[in-house]
Amino acid sequence: MSQIKNNFIESVGNTPLIKLKAASEITGCNIYGKAEYLNPGGSVKDRAALALIKDAQEKKLISEGGIVVEGTAGNTGIGLCLLGNSLGYKTIIVMNDNQTQEKKDTLKNIGADLRLVPPKPYKDDGNYVKVAGRLAEELKSTNNNGVVWAN
């Protein structure tokens, strides 16, 4: 039976456990898989995104009209953007330009401000995570509703 949720945030988590029949029969015990792909963003990373945003809200680092910045390979950014949309936050995602076109298109289609950078090792200042951190710091002086580097 489907459950109606009051808002987008309530749809994150509470994904079902599914009994893995063959594995259960082979082992003689019940084996279950957690169906995290049924989160609204299609990934367990939706849970991490929600925790990051809730933490920022509790610390009063962001309010409606604020900006969430993240350097990501995709799934966390998708979760952050979907949650940000529902809470009135702008989401800026910094990612390597060699990520899959599907992830880039998904992020653009759900409203992320996508910033692509060439792939660089973490020790390099041009690494997407470091670029995201600098961008968040720069934006803090221009937004009164808060800027959070989700990192």
What are these regions (language model features)?
Residues 1-151:
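PLP-dependent amino-acid enzyme catalytic core
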